[in-house]
């Protein structure tokens, strides 16, 4: 009887192993929804539309983008955790949802390690350290020296407490050993206006401010990634002066926990194919200098854990907490 039961279990496992790849080959058989946590025009939305358009050409099945806005992205993430884990509703989410919000907000609805499956990263973008055009410095070392000599401390702008612009500047302050006064604004546009007008003297922003920099309204003195930005190739990285400095934003694709691995792997392969296409690379470049960033689920999981450790430490040191 025991031998017969063992054979039956092996047979079930064998059938399952044969069905899973076939199931993935047939996927998708209907419309796939990509859920974006921010309004149309933001980086996750632009990435979702560019990737979704090209996935629809590969499959071919329709891919629709739905914007579910609210609670700093938690509304969209929570929604995806409660849908059927069948690969037909996916989240296109920014890293801050999972590596900053859990430590910044007293209540965070989604635990990426329990509620979602990372499929692949899609794109990345750098932050640009820009200063008021009238500030008497031309580069990062001069800015650091100027900041050290300034009394009272120079004021810098951000798009809000706990924003990645804010946290990136705090990382730079720590590495450079400078004191700057943080002035949070309601969004990046207001922070940019303040820096151009001289209410503040510096800020980290996205590469979307490249037009203002090229017009001379802001002066870019560094970018936050390991490599120079293709949008601003003449601007050095912070790491050229402070080795190892690396702080960028990334956007990823997530499925509800319980989604079959065969579908996750099918999505990963198709996404990697899309991200390698010249048309996608051009579309990303035209969307504010976003660069394709392709990883496997395991690589993405390691990236999440690395960034969680980094931001948890920083937010704890700053004693930041938002209700």
Q: Model features per residue range: what roles?
A:
Residues 23-114, 153-155, 161, 177-207, ...:
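N-terminal (or domain-start) structured segment
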Residues 1-5:
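N-terminal secretory signal peptides that target proteins for export/translocation
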Residues 82-88, 103-190, 238, 243, ...:
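Hinge/capping helix and adjacent helix->loop/strand transition within the periplasmic-binding protein
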Residues 29-31, 175, 214, 261-323:
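An extracytoplasmic/periplasmic, membrane-proximal ligand-sensing/linker region
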Residues 190-245:
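Anionic-ligand binding region
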Residues 94-95, 133, 206-208, 225, ...:
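Short secondary-structure boundary segments
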Residues 8-20:
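Bacterial N-terminal signal peptides
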């Amino acid at each position: 009887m025991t031998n017969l039961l063992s054979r039956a279990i092996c047979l079930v496992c064998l059938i399952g192993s044969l069905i899973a790849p076939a199931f993935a080959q047939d996927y998708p058989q209907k419309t796939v929804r990509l859920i974006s946590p921010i309004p149309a025009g933001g980086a996750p939305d632009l990435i979702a539309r560019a990737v979704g358009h090209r996935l629809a050409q590969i499959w071919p099945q329709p891919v629709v983008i739905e914007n579910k806005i609210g609670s700093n992205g938690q509304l969209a993430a929570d929604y995806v955790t409660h849908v059927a884990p069948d690969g037909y509703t996916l989240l296109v989410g920014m890293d801050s949802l999972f590596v900053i919000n859990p430590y910044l907000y007293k209540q965070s609805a989604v635990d990426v390690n329990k509620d979602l499956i990372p499929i692949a990263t899609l794109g990345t973008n750098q932050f640009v350290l820009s200063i008021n055009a009238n500030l008497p410095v031309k580069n990062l070392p001069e800015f650091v020296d100027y900041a050290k000599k300034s009394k009272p401390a120079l004021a810098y702008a951000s798009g809000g407490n706990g924003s990645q612009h804010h946290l990136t500047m705090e990382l730079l302050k720590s590495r450079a050993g400078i004191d700057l006064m943080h002035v949070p604004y309601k969004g990046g546009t207001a922070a940019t206006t303040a820096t151009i007008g001289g209410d503040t003297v510096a800020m980290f922003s996205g590469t979307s401010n490249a037009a203002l920099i090229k017009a001379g309204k802001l002066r870019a003195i560094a970018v936050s990634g390991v490599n120079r930005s293709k949008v601003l190739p003449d601007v050095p990285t912070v790491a050229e002066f402070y080795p190892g400095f690396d702080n960028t934003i990334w956007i990823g694709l997530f499925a509800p926990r319980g989604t079959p691995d065969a579908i996750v792997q099918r999505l990963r392969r198709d996404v990697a194919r899309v991200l390698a296409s010249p048309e996608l690379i051009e579309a990303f470049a035209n969307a504010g200098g976003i660069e394709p960033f392709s990883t496997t689920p395991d690589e993405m999981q390691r990236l999440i854990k690395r960034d969680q450790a980094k931001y948890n430490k920083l937010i704890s040191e700053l004693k930041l907490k938002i209700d």
